A protein has these predicted regions:
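Extended terminal accessory/targeting regions
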Residues: 5-10, 18-198
């Protein structure tokens, strides 16, 4: 019964947000959404920083899975099984160094000591990931264009889609204190927070 009410409430919220966007315009809606997301996320960053202070947490050894979500692992498997794939697309995702740099920032939470700083550093790390992937697309566009018979603009568009999807995935799924292994600040002991807007 609770699930049904939660579903109905969720649909009602989505309907209200859509109506808000139509009535007040896309820009106002995006600003409202960004502000709401920031407020929700800042609570998680506050809890994270408080947990670090309270527990005198020390940073653990760096570890990474490459590009998260199983992307690197799947890529490695494809490369091993299909040498032509590896020849064209490399043995690891061409943007894997972007993911490794991103993981380094996430591991240490960028060295943040305040919640607003933590929020800003996380956003900067996610934007740097997106920018790095786009740069990889620009560097590879001529070669891939010749290989696949597509225009360089089409190749860059594909990389824009990849960069946007990865940016959205890390923005949504890697908040601090959510218990996932590759969360913001994953080099520190886990903390927990109930993320509910005020």
């Amino acid at each position: 019964m609770r699930r049904r009410y939660a579903l109905i409430l969720g649909l009602l919220v989505l309907f209200c947000l859509a109506a808000f966007a139509v009535l007040f315009g896309e820009e106002v809606f995006q600003n409202y959404t960004a502000k709401t997301q920031r407020n929700i996320e800042l609570k998680a960053h506050h809890e994270f920083i408080q947990s670090l202070r309270k527990n005198s947490s020390r940073l653990g050894a760096f570890s990474t899975d490459g590009c998260s979500g199983g992307l690197s692992r799947a890529w490695w498997t494809l490369s091993d099984r299909f040498p032509a794939f590896a020849k064209t697309h490399e043995k690891a995702p061409p943007w894997e160094t972007c993911c490794l740099n991103h993981d380094r920032s996430y591991h240490s939470a960028g060295g943040a000591t305040e919640s607003h700083e933590s929020f800003s550093l996380r956003l900067s790390a996610d934007q740097a990931l997106r920018t790095c992937i786009l740069g990889t697309g620009r560097r590879r566009s001529a070669d891939l264009s010749a290989t696949f018979g597509l225009s360089e603009d089409q190749i860059r568009s594909a990389y824009e889609a990849i960069a946007s999807a990865m940016f959205d995935a890390v923005r949504i799924g890697r908040l601090p204190c959510i218990g996932l292994p590759w969360r913001w600040g994953y080099g520190y002991p886990p903390c927990a927070v109930t993320i509910v807007p005020n």
